[in-house]
């Protein structure tokens, strides 16, 4: 928009706003006096970060990037479905301010994906209608609506400008101005099942962190004195570095020159070795050292839109379609020409318009530079682009809205690698697998809310979507996005359709940052009810029912055969593997499609499970997380993760487990009997803890609680450390002559209590208050009172104990756990405990750890306890934010990833509802928006097994009718005979769940007794549980021999009893 391209007073207008909204709103570019919103935005001062709101996002972006976000104003031009998705995500993300620009009015087709519009809003300005609804998402982000022309001074007030679904001429003009004035530009466009994204972040963008991963660190075992020096790390884990990484050293003994020098670039030589700078003039290496990765900022540059259009760089999203980006780059330019000539997009599935677009694409291709020109234009791809270009799909907008919003955040913060510079994505496999005569009249608009979707798929699929019955498990971040998309596409919105959503959780403040159906006034309300009400507001036709049940064995009377058999599919929105596995098993049993997805920060994945066609979720699993050895936690920590986990275990032992044991001892007559049957030293440990709680340490006053906390501080941070050093002095050598305190074992030192040290006082305050709470006593937050009490307390004396065994390995620990305990000491403890009848009415109050309440002392205790132990061992402390992440096992989350992932889920939903039967039509996906990385692959087919000539997969089973025509139930003998005669299988073992019902190795008397018993009677007898009235069938597992006596693997049995 420099004067060389456009005069200062010239105005460029797009098509009239009364035209088809799938083309564009009215666009104006004008230079002159800036409008009002810029002045209002200047009032938005820099504010502190609300960690209770942004906590999950902060674990993705970090505080520094978040501060940059809060200093950035963003303009979004174009408020159709894609624009509103981007706006939603960046408002939730917490930028300084957002201005919504649109001169177009809401039309019926907009309701296919624009979730801020209602049917009564038709004919009103999109930006003005969207502004108050988007402003509710985040009270920290002012949201303005602007419907006038864009002018130079106005654009100059923004750090980032986003253009959505805009004409190419308009993009070029705005792009030139933004590039020349240092304003970051994002251009996004979706056309039915095809989308485009472009980024221009200027010529000198500073990238502070390309991947967002936590800096790696490793322990050093050797550094050579040569050029270049070779560093070898301890062989307990790979260092994980890459050539070109920068690192720094600390705690190196001998070659101390390396400590504290600037970041050193490395070259990786192997999984445990890498080379550094010239170390030949340094001192000899003796021992120790920690090497840590350093994120070094670097500059990256971008071409302006015009130059990049001619010589594009592409981010490939699907390597099965690696030729598509260049083809679609030509196709989109042709599409812009078509729209300019006709003031509309190609008509849905119209052959005449498709032919014209192909001709235009051929012309564009012929004029393209050699680097872009395609030797062979993909005519079929260009035709499909024409067929769907008039469409507007909520899932595509959700996917591109997540990507574009993440690019906006990158532009604001310099965090994560931007898209350089073009990204194209298509989901054309969502169209019918067999190209039947797609009747154009089936895709024409009917002035209803699904017109944008009907333009792509036709009215028949719309009707089918309305009849679907789906079960959504979870109403958190993914659940909210799924429900929004379900409402937009019309899933379960017909007379015969329905959506059932269940979630037992209530809404917390930290949810509001990414679970966008919830508002501040919804805090403490049930998620499922609130989410259902919110999507009814988006689409009043949706038939949705909310439950508050956990999905598991205990609710199978609710989610029973009748419930599952009526479903068309299930969508998971869960946050733990066990629940996912359970739902997956149910879907396999009832042969229902499953849409599975998950996110972790900027990473996300989608898996589609289709009966008989794909493997199930349970067919493959990630390896289990590596746990911290107990000996490391108890005595030899070397990382802050170890001390935080130790503090977390302390919390459970001191304030929960002990109180629960006391209450069970006082109320359960069989508690003592069960405790004495525990393995190893557990009986002694449990009874000692109860004795302490009821006798030795039972407080009567607040002052007693302070005394206990003070004494416990000395036990943990002084006495226990002195005892450890008594057993293993600092200079102790191992049997091989090496220093005991070396490698991963850090030599600790005891602490001396200092009343003027805030960390020491924080520990006593938190521990004393929590201890008081477990006894129902009142606490105090008055530090002065606590300090005064502490001044009067004597310092506990330490005397080393002999005979104390400290385990230095897991093997030692396990061997000790198998040893017997001192029975006489156990009897003494049992005698010393007050009997329950002497403590009638007394009870303790166990505390459940809650990380997100900053007033309950829970995190105060964790932070203080962990950092004091870190000080013991010379480990760098962690702030409250990082400690909460580790202690609370928080899953980092951001709205952008959720939006993108759910968009991909719903693209798979289109295929499932249509009944696609080709495996390659479906796409499992993994994305990492930080890199950016996109990986799509066809699902795996289920593993095939065989017995005799019968092939089977996990989807197959034996269906056995348990009720005979006579009305009597099949006996065990009849069951065994059935498999012998009908399938030539000799059953040698039969089980149901964990219950063994039959085995050839059973005692003859038991076998004779069971053979004539009905199957359900045997199940009830063995499991000691009566079958509920909701149970209509049972699952049996078989071990069988063939007729030749060989072991063979066979499917499970569905035994039908009702």
Curated annotation (Swiss-Prot):
Ligase is among the record's keywords: yes
Protein's pathway: Protein modification; protein ubiquitination
Signal sequence segment: none
Chain residues that bind ATP: 477, 503, 514, 527, 575-576
Gene Ontology MF terms: ATP binding; ubiquitin activating enzyme activity
Annotated stretches, region: Disordered: 1-22
UniProt keywords, alphabetically: ATP-binding, Ligase, Nucleotide-binding, Ubl conjugation pathway
Active site: 631
Reaction catalysis annotation: ATP + ubiquitin + [E1 ubiquitin-activating enzyme]-L-cysteine = AMP + diphosphate + S-ubiquitinyl-[E1 ubiquitin-activating enzyme]-L-cysteine
Broad class of enzyme this protein falls into: ligase
Family, per entry: Belongs to the ubiquitin-activating E1 family.
Subunit (UniProt): Monomer.
UniProt name for this protein: Ubiquitin-like modifier-activating enzyme 1 Y
Organism: Mus musculus (Mouse)
């Amino acid at each position: 928009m420099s004067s060389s391209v456009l005069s200062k007073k010239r105005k460029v207008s797009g098509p009239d706003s009364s035209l088809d909204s799938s083309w564009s709103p009215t666009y104006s570019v004008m230079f002159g006096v800036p409008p009002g919103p810029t002045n209002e935005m200047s009032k938005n001062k820099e504010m502190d970060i609300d960690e209770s709101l942004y906590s999950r996002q902060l674990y993705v972006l970090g505080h520094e990037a978040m501060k940059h976000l809060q200093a950035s104003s963003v303009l979004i031009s174009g408020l159709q479905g894609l624009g509103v998705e981007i706006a939603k995500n960046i408002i939730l993300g917490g930028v300084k301010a957002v201005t919504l620009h649109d001169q177009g009015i809401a039309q019926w087709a907009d309701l296919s994906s624009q979730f801020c519009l209602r049917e009564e809003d038709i004919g009103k300005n999109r930006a003005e209608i969207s502004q108050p609804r988007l402003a509710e998402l985040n009270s920290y982000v002012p949201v303005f609506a602007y419907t006038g022309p864009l002018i130079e001074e106005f654009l100059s007030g923004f750090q980032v400008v986003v253009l959505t679904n805009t004409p190419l001429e308009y993009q070029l003009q705005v792009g030139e101005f933004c590039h020349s004035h240092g304003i970051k530009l994002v251009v996004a466009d979706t056309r039915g099942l095809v989308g485009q994204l472009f980024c221009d972040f200027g010529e000198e963008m500073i990238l502070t962190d390309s991947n967002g991963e936590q800096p790696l660190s490793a322990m050093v075992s050797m550094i050579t004195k040569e050029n270049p020096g070779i560093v070898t790390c301890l062989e307990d884990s790979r260092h994980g570095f890459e050539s070109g990484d920068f690192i720094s050293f600390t705690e190196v003994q001998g070659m101390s020159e390396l400590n504290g020098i600037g970041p050193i670039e490395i070259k990786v030589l192997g999984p445990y070795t890498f080379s550094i700078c010239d170390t030949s003039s340094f001192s000899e290496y003796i021992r120790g050292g920690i090497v840590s990765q350093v994120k070094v900022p670097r500059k990256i540059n971008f071409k302006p839109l015009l130059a990049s259009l001619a010589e594009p760089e592409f981010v490939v999203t699907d390597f099965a379609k690696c030729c598509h980006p260049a083809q679609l780059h030509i196709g989109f330019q042709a599409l812009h020409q078509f729209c300019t000539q006709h003031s509309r997009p190609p008509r849905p599935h119209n052959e005449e318009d498709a032919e014209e677009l192909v001709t235009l694409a051929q012309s564009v291709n012929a004029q393209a530079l050699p680097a872009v020109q395609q030797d062979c234009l993909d005519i079929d791809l260009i035709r499909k682009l024409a067929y769907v270009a008039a469409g507007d799909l909520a899932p595509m907008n959700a996917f591109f809205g997540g990507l574009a919003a993440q690019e906006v955040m990158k532009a604001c913060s310099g965090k994560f690698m931007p898209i350089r510079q073009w990204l194209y994505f298509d989901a054309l496999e969502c169209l019918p697998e067999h190209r039947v005569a797609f009747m154009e009249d089936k895709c024409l608009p009917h002035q209803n809310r699904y017109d944008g979707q009907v333009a792509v798929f036709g009215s028949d699929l719309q009707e089918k979507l309305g009849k679907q019955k789906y079960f959504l498990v979870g109403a958190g971040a993914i659940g909210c996005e799924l429900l929004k998309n379900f409402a937009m596409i019309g899933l379960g919105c017909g007379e015969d359709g329905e959506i059932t959503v269940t979630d037992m959780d209530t809404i917390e403040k930290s949810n509001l940052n990414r679970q966008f159906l919830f508002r501040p006034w919804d805090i403490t309300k049930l998620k499922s009810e609130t989410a259902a009400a919110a999507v009814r507001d988006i689409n009043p036709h949706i038939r949705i029912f909310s439950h508050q049940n956990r999905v598991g064995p205990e609710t199978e009377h609710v989610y029973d055969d009748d419930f599952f058999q009526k479903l068309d599919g299930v969508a998971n929105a869960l946050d733990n593997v066990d629940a996912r596995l359970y739902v997956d098993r149910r879907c396999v049993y009832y042969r229902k499609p499953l849409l599975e997805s998950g996110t972790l920060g900027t990473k996300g994945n989608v898996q589609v499970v289709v009966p008989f066609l794909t493997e199930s979720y349970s067919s493959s699993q990630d390896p289990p997380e590596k746990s911290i050895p107990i000996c490391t936690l108890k005595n030899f920590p070397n990382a802050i993760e170890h001390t935080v986990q130790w503090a977390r275990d302390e919390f459970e032992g001191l304030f929960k487990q002990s109180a629960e044991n006391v209450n069970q001892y006082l109320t359960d007559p069989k508690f003592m009997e069960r405790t004495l049957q525990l393995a190893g030293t557990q009986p002694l440990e449990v009874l000692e803890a109860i004795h302490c709680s009821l006798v030795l340490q039972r407080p009567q006053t607040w002052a007693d609680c302070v005394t206990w906390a003070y004494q416990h501080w000395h036990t943990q941070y002084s006495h226990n450390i002195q005892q450890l050093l008594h057993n293993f002095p600092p200079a102790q050598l191992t049997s091989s002559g090496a220093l005991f305190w070396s490698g991963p074992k850090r030599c600790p030192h005891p602490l001396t209590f200092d009343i003027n040290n805030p960390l020491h006082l924080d520990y006593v305050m938190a521990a004393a208050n929590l201890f008081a709470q477990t006894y129902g006593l009142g606490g105090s937050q008055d530090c002065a009172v606590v300090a005064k009490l502490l001044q009067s307390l004597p310092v506990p004396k330490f005397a080393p104990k002999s005979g104390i065994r400290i385990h230095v390995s897991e093997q030692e620990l396990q061997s000790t756990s198998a040893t017997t305990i001192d029975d006489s000491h156990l009897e003494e403890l049992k005698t010393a405990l007050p009997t329950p009848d002497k403590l009638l009415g007394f009870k303790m109050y166990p505390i459940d750890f809650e990380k997100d309440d900053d007033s309950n002392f829970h995190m105060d205790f964790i932070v203080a306890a962990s950092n004091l132990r870190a000080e013991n061992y010379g480990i760098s402390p962690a702030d409250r934010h990082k400690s909460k992440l580790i202690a609370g096992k928080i899953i980092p989350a951001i709205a952008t990833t959720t939006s993108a992932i759910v968009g991909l889920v719903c693209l798979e939903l289109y295929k499932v509802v249509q009944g696609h039967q080709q495996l390659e039509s479906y796409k499992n996906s993994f994305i990492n928006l930080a890199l950016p990385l996109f990986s799509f692959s066809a699902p795996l087919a289920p593993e095939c097994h065989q017995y005799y000539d019968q092939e089977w997969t996990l989807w197959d089973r034996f269906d056995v009718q348990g009720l005979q025509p006579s009305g009597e139930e099949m006996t065990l003998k009849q069951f065994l005979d059935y498999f012998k005669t009908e399938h030539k299988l000799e059953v040698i073992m039969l089980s149901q769940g964990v219950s063994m019902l039959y085995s050839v190795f059973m005692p003859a008397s038991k076998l004779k007794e069971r053979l004539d018993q009905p199957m359900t009677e045997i199940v009830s007898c063995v499991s000691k549980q009566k079958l509920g009235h909701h149970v209509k069938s049972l699952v049996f597992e078989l071990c069988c021999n063939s007729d030749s006596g060989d072991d063979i693997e066979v499917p499970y049995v569905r035994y039908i009893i009702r």
